[in-house]
């Protein structure tokens, strides 16, 4: 755990201990869309276990994964209405509520996994998502979803290889613009429709994390995965503002500490899990894994420069500049997961 998180949550934990007698018996519900083998499914489990431990059994959490409570759009509506207490979600799906959150969609933003982990544990990272509270969604902490890569029936080694292909993206303007800038036909589509659409030829390709490519079986209908890492996707544990406001100080402290613990677990496990899946793909010989050289990856960054020109001011040039300054001491490292 970083020094920042240690300092903050040590004080919160102390507050919880001092006010332990005021912790009430509470039953919460968390939803997410992850499959059991995905790291963020484990994050939900870790959060539930730590919440129960810290509250000495008074606060319990039922985790409903694999879209049992609905898709992410439905989940966010439930969070805003206070029908569901917690959700685990990618920042890319929160851009509709805050322009600043869209900064994480800018292509090739983070220099390395190390830089990403350090930034996610910084005060600035929490400042970026603070405006979500005005929309009824409170962010509790970050962990990585992983690098997003191109999976396709075309061997993609340079931006020109993407030209003309029909690629599914999340319905977020910047994510669509990334592939439009390379000449692809970017098609926004609900995640649950991707496999069938690939199978039926409605789309030629998608862009997802290795965990999603593996867990959803996309590799069975696409021949290639190109490790371009155009986005390093942050995930958030969020709580309904309605639920948050119903908690007393001791309960809030326990929720924050449990979330910090679960997010740190996610930070430690996501990239390793993705690397293990890549090794499994390589050993099986399917799909073919295409690893880009630094020179090849730089061509993708150059090809998407227009996305920055179009969107950096709308997401907040000051926020972007702060992220880049934060990374100055970190070396560039190509994604291996």
Which ranges hold each PLM region?
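Hydrophobic helical h-region of N-terminal Sec-dependent signal peptides
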Residues: 9-18
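N-terminal secretory/targeting leader peptides
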Residues: 10, 25-115, 123-337
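Sec/Tat signal peptide C-region and signal peptidase I cleavage site
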Residues: 17-25
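Bacterial N-terminal signal peptides that target proteins for export
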Residues: 1-10
């Amino acid at each position: 755990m970083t020094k920042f998180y240690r300092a903050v949550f040590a004080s919160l934990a102390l507050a919880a201990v001092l006010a332990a007698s005021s912790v009430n018996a509470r039953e919460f519900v968390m939803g997410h869309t992850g499959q059991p083998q995905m790291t963020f499914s484990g994050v939900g489990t870790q959060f539930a276990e730590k919440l129960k431990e810290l509250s000495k059994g008074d606060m319990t959490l039922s985790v409903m994964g694999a879209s049992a409570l609905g898709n992410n759009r439905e989940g966010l509506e439930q969070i805003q209405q206070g029908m569901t207490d917690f959700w685990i979600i990618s920042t890319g799906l929160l851009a509709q509520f805050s322009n600043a959150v869209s900064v994480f969609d800018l292509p090739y933003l983070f220099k390395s996994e190390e830089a990403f982990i350090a930034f996610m544990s910084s005060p600035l990272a929490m400042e970026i998502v603070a405006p979500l509270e005005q929309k009824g969604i409170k962010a509790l902490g970050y962990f990585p979803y992983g690098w997003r890569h191109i999976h396709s029936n075309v061997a993609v080694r340079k931006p020109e290889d993407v030209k003309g292909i029909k690629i599914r993206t999340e319905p977020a303007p910047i994510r669509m613009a990334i592939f439009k800038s390379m000449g692809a036909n970017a098609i926004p589509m609900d995640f649950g429709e991707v496999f069938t659409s690939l199978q039926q030829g409605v789309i030629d390709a998608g862009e997802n994390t290795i965990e999603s490519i593996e867990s959803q079986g996309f590799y069975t209908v696409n021949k290639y995965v190109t490790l371009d890492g155009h986005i390093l996707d942050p995930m958030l544990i969020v709580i309904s503002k309605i639920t948050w406001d119903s908690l007393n100080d001791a309960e809030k402290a326990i929720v924050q500490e449990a979330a910090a613990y679960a997010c740190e677990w996610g930070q430690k496990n996501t990239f390793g899990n993705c690397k293990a899946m890549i090794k499994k793909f390589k050993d099986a010989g399917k799909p073919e894994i295409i690893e880009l050289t630094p020179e090849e990856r730089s061509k993708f960054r150059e090809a998407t420069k227009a996305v920055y020109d179009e969107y950096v001011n709308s997401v907040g040039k000051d926020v972007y500049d702060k992220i880049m300054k934060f990374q100055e001491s970190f070396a560039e490292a190509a994604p291996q997961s």
